[in-house]
Amino acid sequence: AVERNPESSEVGILFAAHMRGRAGARAIDTALTTMRCSNGPSARAMRSFGPTAATDVTGFGLAGHLLEMLRGAGVAAELDLARIPLYPSVLALAEAGIVSSLLPENGRLATSVAELSGPDASVHAILFDPQTAGGLLIGVPEAQAAACLDAIRAAGADDAAIIGRVLGVY
C-alpha cells in the first residue's frame, strides 16, 4: 500500500497560477499552511508498521518519487487517482493548462509509466508537479496499511490517504 501525507501534491501548479493571478486566496493559504507542517509526526507514526520505503515528495513530484522508490525495489504500483489529496482548485487549474515550468523536465520520467488512464494531460501535470515541502510517500505492507493510516491521521495528518498498492516485481 502507498500512503501520502495531506494535500501536498501540486504546489507548482498553484504557484504558477498565482503568478498569473489565477489562484484563489483559499488555495494559496491552504498550501502555505500545509507547507509549514512538519512531516516529523507522520514519520514517527509510520515506524511501527514496517515501512518498506518512504520519502518526502519534493521537486520530482509524486510520480517521480514513486518511480524512484519502485525502481529501487524492482516492483510496480497502481495508483487510485481519485484518492490523491489535492489542494482546492488544482484539478481545474491543470485542466486549464496551467502547469509549473518544471513539468516538462519532470514529465520525461513518464517513459516509465506503463499506463495512465483518466483526464490524461491534467493528471500527468498533477502527478509530475514539483513540490516544495511536500508530504510523505510511504510504502508499508498491505496488511498494515489501514492501521498505519490511522496512526498518521492521529498524528495530525488528517488528509493522509492510501493512494494505491504495490503490484509486485516488474
Where are these regions (language model features)?
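Helix-biased detector of long, well-ordered alpha-helical tracts
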Residues: A1-Y170
